[in-house]
Amino acid sequence: MSQPDPVTPVTPVTQDVPEVSGRPVTVSVLGSCITRDNFNSRFNPDYKRWYRVGPTTNQSSMIALMSPPVDEPWEPVQEMKPYGLWNVRSDLSREILTLLPEEQPDVVVLDFFGDAHFGVVRLPDGRFVTDNRWRIHKTDLYERILAMPGTEQLSWEQDADGYFGLWVEAMDRFAAYVADQLPDTQVVVHWGFNADEVVPSGESTPRRMPSRRRRAARKRNAFWRRLNEHASSAYGWESIDLSREYYVTLDDHPWGPMEVHYTLDYYPRFLAELDRVVLTRSAPEEVRVLARELHEAAAEYTRDTARWRIAAHEHQRALAVERERPTWKRVLRPRGPGAAPVPPAPPAATATLLEALRGAVDDDAFARLSRLATTAEEHVRWLRETPPTLSAD
């Protein structure tokens, strides 16, 4: 076996990042549970060693967030828990835009669940609210808004290009707000997506969701990816994209099965990627290059294994179909799928990259950066060991 090319060692450095100064990095989340759950001890037990959660929003549309506040009085017309009441108040008041400059968080992580899943309601005066069927629909304000002449419900399902245009205008305003009010804050785009398979309770084999739900998830993913791509490319922000690594949902998720409640190996994987972004922000170029190459090797390994899993399961299904044909047909007109796909090998460069990093950063930073490789390997193990996906029936 050929040896990987040597990586030139770099001089050890002291990382000029907040956690070395003795305090955790403050992270604010403008998004949903797909991001917020990464800062929950159920999913990442040790996250508080390195991160502190600052002001957040939940499930707000960026279009609504960047329009003027809606300060009309309101009351719930259905039972709502305190968190749901806060959710409505936060969305209507845009309080996050006041809280962030006061906090000056080190990092803001964005995800666009609110726009991908809900859309907005445009009031006659041009203000917007998030059309959240789980929250504001339970208030008398929502009933009053819908009764106003000139009110419009807008979603990408109705007009993808029109909605995208409104969203880009809002994002441009948000980017200007960050530059003016949060000049030292690092913005990270978390690429959310919808899973379309679910692992039933007590089982290990994923099942496809019903076809209608799968089609809806795929359409939503296409628009969500459009949002992610724009936010990642237009404003010079960092991004974390695990959407091509093949994650499913599960009945035994702490919050129950849903397209955005991923298998539990997702959350350590996300945190490893965030560690890379945070730890290398002010690092020497050599360290940034090593961490980026380790990240790329881990991502390629998981994506290649995800593709292999799909191909291997298709191969097994093709073999099963061939075995059902009469023997004489198989002999005279074989239609076998050929050789089975071979799973990808672990990246040869990983060990060399880790060795170079060990000599370039302190022990804590090395332990965290090395999780780029270990969390990828954990997910690869799941991809290899999990039985083939079954149909929804």
Model region roles, listed by residue range:
Residues D5, P12-V107:
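Basic, amphipathic N-terminal segments that precede the first structured/catalytic domain
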Residues S90-R94, A160-A176, R213-E229, L264-P268:
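Well-ordered, non-membrane alpha-helical segments in soluble/globular domains
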Residues Y83, I136-D172, R207-R218, M258:
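Surface-exposed cleft-lining segments at the edges of enzyme active sites
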Residues G150-E157, A175-R215:
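Active-site segments of SGNH/GDSL-like serine hydrolases
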Residues P254-E293:
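Histidine-centered active-site loop/cap adjacent to the catalytic His
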